[in-house]
UniProtKB/Swiss-Prot annotation:
Keywords: Acetylation, Cytoplasm, Hydrolase, Nucleus, Protein phosphatase. It comes from the Eukaryota. Its main location: cytoplasm. This is CDC25-like phosphatase YCH1. It comes from Saccharomyces cerevisiae (strain ATCC 204508 / S288c) (Baker's yeast). It holds the Pfam family Rhodanese. Belongs to the MPI phosphatase family. The lineage of its organism: Eukaryota, Fungi, Dikarya, Ascomycota, Saccharomycotina. GO terms for cellular component: cytoplasm; nucleus. It is found in: Cytoplasm; Nucleus.
Length: 148
């Protein structure tokens, strides 16, 4: 297995992700993307629409769960429309989001890594909901009373 570092993971601002969601692909390269929400018990009160939920606590403990995520992501990328941009986030994207991105990164070989671009959503869901919580086109299950 190859060795990668956090430099292989970039940060993405919520405004850029919002733009991607509105356009249906990344802005510059027109590539597909997938949001992965790694919150655990704090996965309530809303989530980014069409995001996949893979709790970090399970990803770090269960190799099969991580393989499932990796398989789904590589399968989604298999359509040949360029690299799949994978955006991880947790509540603040300070620990679990970056750690989950590193777990996936370390599970990829060189060929697989060439098929993915890894991101962490800057500010996590907390920042996302403060701007886009009420926007039902990009946020699902939002409960504003939990955020006041």
């Amino acid at each position: 297995m190859d060795s990668y570092s956090i430099t292989n993971v970039k940060y993405l601002d919520p405004t850029e992700l919002h733009r991607w969601m509105q356009e249906g692909h990344t802005t510059t390269l027109r590539e597909p993307f997938q949001v992965v929400d790694v919150r655990g018990s704090d996965y309530m009160g809303g989530h980014i629409k069409d995001g996949w939920h893979y709790a970090y606590s399970r990803l770090k403990q269960d190799p099969e769960y991580l393989r499932e995520l990796k398989h789904r992501l590589l399968e989604k990328q298999a359509d040949g429309r360029g690299a799949l941009n994978v955006i991880f986030h947790c509540m603040l994207s300070q620990q679990r989001g970056p750690s989950a991105a590193m777990l996936l990164l370390r599970s990829l070989d060189t060929a697989e890594l060439s098929r993915c671009r890894l991101w962490v959503l800057r500010g996590g869901f907390s920042r996302w909901q403060s701007v886009y919580g009420d926007d039902e086109s990009v946020t699902a299950g939002y409960l504003p009373d939990l955020w006041r």
